[in-house]
């Protein structure tokens, strides 16, 4: 699948006057979205906890995780999503968790985000209870 970017506004959920806009790489292989820590700190987003992650090259890394408001321009919607405080030179990545929160998938032919229907539960959720 070809790589592409989407414009995203990141906003401090506790102070909506503090935000920035950036082009993010859409990365379905990344569980979480990544933003360079100085950008998140610059708008006052605070870490909530630490997460151990496996990076694309196989290394393990401990990173801070917080929450921010994400507005994906082409969707015109705003939702709270988890975000990893990346290194200063980190790429801006829009990960699978954010994509699922917004109810979208990637259309590789058009390099656009497309709406999907959410699945609630599975086999056990569909069984009658006696």
Predicted feature locations:
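Pepsin/retropepsin-fold aspartyl endopeptidases
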Residues: 1-130
